[in-house]
Amino acid sequence: LLNDVEMGNQNGKPKLDIFSPRMADDLEGKSYVISVSMMAGCYRHIQISCNALLVELHSAIIDAFGFDDDHAHAFFMDDKIWSHNNSFYMRGVEDFGSRTTDRYRLSQAGLNKGKKFKYLFDFGDEWRFQCKVLQVKEEETEAPVIVKSKGEAPEQYPNWDDE
């Protein structure tokens, strides 16, 4: 994980950044319950360790909605799609932002109860997900768990024919 110097600007001075490794300590051994919705009536509540990487949340969301993990993804912590202010992108698309989902933990992303943020999957089709932290639980979970599910997810490739 990055320290303040690695996150610094070209002069080696640390940037002011809400995404700080120091936030991780008070969330050790805890988990988030995050509501992830695609559209009205279709959502999943996912419990995931506060210590999990953002890429693990990405995988949990894709699995929860039955999508294939075959496209780029990003998280927008300021709740604005395509914002470059507080965003995390998958490795390989760093042109969009310097923070990658495989290097930052949820505990470093400034999450707390009530925090809303966006998740974008497939930059071409733009599958947009609204995320909201419902609670911070005192117990940790080893792997992400779907604790509530409502509605049927749309097909990822509705016009794709098996030939």
Q: Locations of the language-model features?
A:
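Short linear regulatory motifs enriched in tryptophan with gly/pro/ser
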Residues: L1-E163
